[in-house]
Curated annotation (Swiss-Prot):
Family per record: Belongs to the class I-like SAM-binding methyltransferase superfamily. TrmB family.
HAMAP family recorded: tRNA_methyltr_TrmB (MF_01057)
Organism name: Burkholderia pseudomallei (strain K96243)
GO MF term set: tRNA (guanine(46)-N7)-methyltransferase activity
InterPro entries membership: SAM-dependent_MTases_sf, tRNA_(Gua-N-7)_MeTrfase_Trmb, tRNA_methyltr_TrmB_bact
Region (Disordered): 1-40
A GO cellular-component term linked to this record: tRNA methyltransferase complex
Keywords noted in UniProt: Methyltransferase, S-adenosyl-L-methionine, Transferase, tRNA processing
Pathway: tRNA modification; N(7)-methylguanine-tRNA biosynthesis
Reactions catalysed, as given in the entry: guanosine(46) in tRNA + S-adenosyl-L-methionine = N(7)-methylguanosine(46) in tRNA + S-adenosyl-L-homocysteine
UniProt binding sites for S-adenosyl-L-methionine: E95, E120, D147, D170
Protein's UniProt name: tRNA (guanine-N(7)-)-methyltransferase
Coiled coil regions, renumbered to chain: none
Amino acid sequence: MIHDDDPNAPGAPHDDDATAAPASATRAAPAAGDDDDANPLHLRRIRSFVTRAGRVSTGQRRAIDELGPRFVIPYGSAQPDWDAIFGRRAPRVLEIGFGMGASTAEIAALRPGDDFIGVEVHEPGVGALLKLIGEQQLSNIRIIQHDAVEVLAQMIAPDSLDGVHIFFPDPWHKARHHKRRLIQPPFVAQLAAHLKPGAYLHCATDWQNYAEQMLEVLSADPSLENTAQDYAPRPGYRPVTKFERRGLRLGHGVWDLVFRKKHAG
């Protein structure tokens, strides 16, 4: 995910809590030594991230130590009682790859009646979002620090999500790497299976080629329907990041896609 505090973005600031930012948390890469082209089953091993080293700042570490026990849910093979974890029954949205969490926190503050499960593998991003949770006194976010593909399979019940957010996943812009992209038919089918009928899947990217692939893959899934003719206007709840503003000023495009799960029959 590209976010306001990404130090890998052009012109991004380098402060104490930003220097450890992952470039993207929604990166699908094969394990070292895998030969995707020789193994037709490589999609079974798709990951929602790429391993990236990062330094955890003092503020992030403090947030992890102080707030982690309440807001970070350990990965496990059983489905948690999410109503009990959040202390209520409310619409539930899964965000895959929240980066440094600025957009996640802003959306959660804007939508206090909804609960958000953020999945991110990189510890600096987890610490950054926990820091925002503490500063803004947000109670409607929980975090799982693990691969989103496995989280979805093990910890999220079918037909249980009211929404899924995937903002600015790694575009893998070289043609030979397109098979590593997260938005592929098997994963989209898995996402759709965990959405309630009528629930939405919202993807955003600033790479036109990836936007075109997203549109093709999402449109081909028989359980999903597009809410727009092709690309959707940016929903008001999705913040415009500093990186995105710079890109728009330079004439770069951003594409939002919002699909809904069809009702049975």
